[in-house]
Regions:
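N-terminal beta-strand motif that seeds the catalytic metal site of vicinal oxygen chelate
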Residues: 15, 23-60, 93-100, 152
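Mid-chain, well-packed structural core segment of small domains
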Residues: 94-122
Length: 152
């Protein structure tokens, strides 16, 4: 199931990329490659900061009632399904955070580094095999911390 809607372009460059040919992209050019298409990127969830566990549970339960999804408790947060994460004690970001799912974190990190977005290495979370399943960017955008995530 696709969780986002992409606009498919029909330019020759895009078609060549889709056929598996290697293509380069620089921060100063517009090309058919974008992270949504290249990394099957979509919004995994929105994070909301609560001041304590009771408030977090109440907020998550409201989203659960709104969307008919289960409330799932994790050590740092409550989830309403997989769409909304409510942090128990003021998580990252002034206003909260946005998690973007990608299919290849190392490649996505390289892509975004080429555009001047730095990774906060202290935020990196690893799978037992040593691969990354979550990492934040250093800077917020409009008060939101941004992280990349992959399936564990």
């Amino acid at each position: 199931m696709r969780r986002h809607a992409s606009r498919f372009r029909t330019s020759p460059i895009y078609l060549n990329y889709r056929k598996g040919e290697t293509m380069t992209d620089s921060p100063n050019t517009t090309s058919a490659i974008n992270p949504v298409e290249q990394f099957d990127m979509y919004v995994a969830h929105v994070g909301i900061n609560a001041s304590n566990a009771d408030e977090a549970e109440k907020i998550a339960n409201l989203f659960t009632a709104l969307m008919g999804l289960p409330t799932i408790e994790q050590p740092p947060s409550f989830f309403a399904g997989t769409l909304v994460e409510v942090m128990k004690q003021n998580g990252r970001g002034t206003k909260g955070h946005i998690g973007f799912h990608v299919n290849n974190i190392p490649a996505a990190e390289k892509y975004f580094a080429g555009r001047g977005f730095e990774i906060d290495e202290t935020s990196r979370r690893l799978n037992p095999d040593g691969s990354t399943f979550l990492v934040y960017f250093k800077d917020e955008i409009a008060g939101f911390a941004i992280h990349l995530t992959m399936d564990k």
